[in-house]
Amino acid sequence: VYIRKKENVFMTKIIKRPWGSYIVIAKSKDYLLKKITVKPEGVLSYQSHNFRSEHWIIIEGKATIILNNRTYYKSANEHIFIPKKAKHRVLNESLKKKLVIVEVQTGSKFLESDIKRFSDIYGRSK
């Protein structure tokens, strides 16, 4: 289901991934807003983006974030900035609780193909 209002696009379709899922909440030429849910023990690939930076706000759970080989621990109401071209990943190390992140992407392109994977536990690295 898509609802269009001026340049914003609101989507209610849940996109499934091996680590969990995401929903695109809003998109314009200047930003893309996602709600990301990482299942218990889920791990996103160690990746970078050429055309976008990301702001992650932790909504629920505890995130272990690897940013350029440095580890950060973030909980609800905390945030981190991921500059474009920075290598990064997030892990949900909980055995039972989900991790929920609001991601704000800024940059010149917001494409799922703008992912360079360096490692991935689900076999998706190139």
Regions found by a protein language model. Give the residues of each.
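A short, N-terminal "cap"/entry segment at the start of jelly-roll beta-barrel domains
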Residues: 1-34, 43-46, 115-126
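Short acidic-glycine-tyrosine-enriched beta hairpin
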Residues: 69-87
